[in-house]
């Protein structure tokens, strides 16, 4: 994989962050033409890859591509790294892969993604378990219609089980 792709640089990612997350541009195969993002389970085992089209994709291509059979509803991106961090601090939950990666690069290492704006029942269980030794969860979803709706649903479900804080972003369309 080519690790010095212009898209990664444009996103402001450092070579160290690109290496930490195993990011790279795929020139062949099912993820051809995409930035590849390895996805690990909570134990650090590789369970899949996401392919992100660099920039705005053509109309006939989705922005993200996941391998056939991969069920994102059962995984929480970056939980393997976030679980190793200091236990007393809250777990930050965001929507996207690059939200996690950018926050990680800025020093927020207790950050995970549900890989979309909709929290599944399985992801809810994983987050509750992962935050048992922390001071709750912080929801920081995109400031758009899907993000606000997903944040409200996640808040209602998670607040029954733990302390949840919400960090609304300052402007429409903003991402963490």
Regions found by a protein language model. Name each.
Residues 158-163:
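Conserved phosphate-handling catalytic cores of large alpha/beta enzymes
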Residues 21, 27-134, 151:
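Phosphate-handling DNA/RNA-contact segment within nucleic-acid enzymes
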């Amino acid at each position: 994989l080519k690790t010095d792709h212009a898209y990664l640089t444009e996103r402001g990612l450092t070579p160290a962050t690109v290496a930490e997350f195993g990011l790279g541009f795929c020139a062949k195969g099912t993820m051809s033409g995409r930035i590849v993002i390895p996805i690990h389970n909570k134990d650090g085992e590789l369970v899949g890859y996401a392919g992100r089209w660099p920039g705005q994709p053509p109309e006939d291509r989705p922005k993200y591509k996941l391998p056939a059979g991969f069920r994102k509803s059962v995984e929480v991106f970056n939980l393997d790294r976030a679980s190793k961090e200091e236990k007393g601090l809250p777990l930050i939950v965001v929507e996207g892969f690059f939200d996690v990666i950018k926050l990680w690069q800025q020093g927020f290492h207790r950050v995970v993604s549900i890989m979309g704006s909709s929290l599944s029942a399985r992801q809810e269980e994983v987050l509750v378990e992962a935050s048992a030794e922390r001071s709750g969860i912080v929801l920081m979803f995109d400031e758009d219609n899907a993000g606000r709706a997903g944040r409200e649903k996640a808040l209602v479900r998670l607040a029954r089980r733990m302390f949840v804080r919400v960090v609304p972003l300052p402007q429409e369309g903003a991402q963490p």
